Amino acid sequence: FVELISRSGLFAWISVKILKVSGGDPFKLLICFSGLTVVFSAFLNNVTAMIIVGSLTIVACKKLKLSAMPFLLAEGIYTNIGGLLTLISSIPNIIVGTAAGIKYTDFLIVAGPYCLIAFVATLYLVRYLFKIKPLSNEVEKAKAKVMVDAFDEWETVEDRTFFYLSALVLCAIILGFALHSSIPVLNQMGLEVIAIIGATVMLVIYPTDVEGVLNEVEWTLVLFFLGLFTLLGVMEHAGVLTMIGELLKTPLSAGETIGPIAMMWSSAFFSGLTDNIPLAAVLAKVLEGFQSNIAELDWFADYGHMLWWSLIFGAGLGGNFTPIGSASTVVAIGILKKEGHNVTFMQYVKIGAIVVLVQLTLATGYLFGAEKVGLIKKMNTEKASTEEVQGHGSNGH
């Protein structure tokens, strides 16, 4: 479905429109591209979002004679904020959200406000770290506007009928996701069924190269999941997950404040050192084990819901810690290298560590505040239907 939308030129069209809104001002450009990155990474594969926005960023920076490094590194950071926005925005969200029984709308209600807070805080943090300054006078603003107006948003749109159809179907799909649990007919479908229906409608009304689209499917990711969940099953039967659970029981049961903090910060740390998908899968299995024995674990009954959310936030945000903790950051650094900008491991860590520290501090305060005002509620012990999220493993680090 996403590949069909991409081929229509819709995403590139949106990108250029937003670029023109900035007027060529570096800080406004940072705001626009960061916002675009969050939106794209919320609905697309994080790597795809980084490639789309990153390629446009390179062109824009060349035209405006700006260094692309701060913009691309910022976009790599923002993909992880966008990946936290909805239940299907990233693979860890899907894995943990399914195990915890979190609905699409409930996830958005909890994660949405934090993403907005993190967006603004990270924006000014990145502006400070990279010393991005707005245009200072009217002459500079007028010159930049002339450059930006030279962009043609319709350049990548080969067929306007296909373009408008894609926009209509995309809006319908997003609306279907949001209203999934509220409308009985949609509630009987998995989210993947809604996406498949959208793609089918586009193929029927506007036939295209089906074989070419299928070639773009991330089959290696599908095989990765087959292997991952097979391995998790073996680990579960061999008692490895039980052993991990026993090791984690002490810090996680240390209290309704210490437990969630320990989960969030430790998962964020390890997420920055390794891929967050297997990390989220293993820890979700461990929490599932605690949940299945909730009658015997009073502490999990009291604040288990906070442990689930702490894992979601920790695994999602920790990837900003190192350049290898997030696939989108790897892509951003790769694009920069092609353009002659080399970013070393330690150069990135000096920035990433500060960003993660600020984002996790905000997330910690936010989660406890959200629970206090009733945004985060105690969860049912039963799992969410796996049908709700199967097939949407398109986003990871």
Protein language model regions, located:
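Membrane-embedded alpha-helical segments and adjacent helix-loop junctions characteristic
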Residues: F1-S67, T220-W299
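Alpha-helical transmembrane segments in multi-pass membrane proteins
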Residues: V2, L29, F33, T37, ...
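Hydrophobic transmembrane alpha-helices of multi-pass small-molecule transporters
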Residues: V2-R7, G112-E246, V343, Q347-H397
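Short, amphipathic, aromatic/basic-enriched membrane-interface segments that mark the entry/exit
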Residues: K17-P26, W154-Y164, L297-A301, Q347
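Membrane-interface alpha-helices at helix entry/exit sites of multi-pass transporters
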Residues: G24-C32, K62-A74, I102-G112, I294-L307, ...
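Alpha-helical transmembrane segments and, especially, the helix-loop junctions at the ends
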Residues: S41-I51, A68-D106, V110, T122-Y128, ...
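Membrane-helix interface "capping/anchor" motifs
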Residues: K62-P70, Y206-E216, D275
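Short helix-coil transition/hinge motifs at the ends and kinks of transmembrane helices
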Residues: I183-Q188, G255-E256, Q291-G304, K338-H341, ...
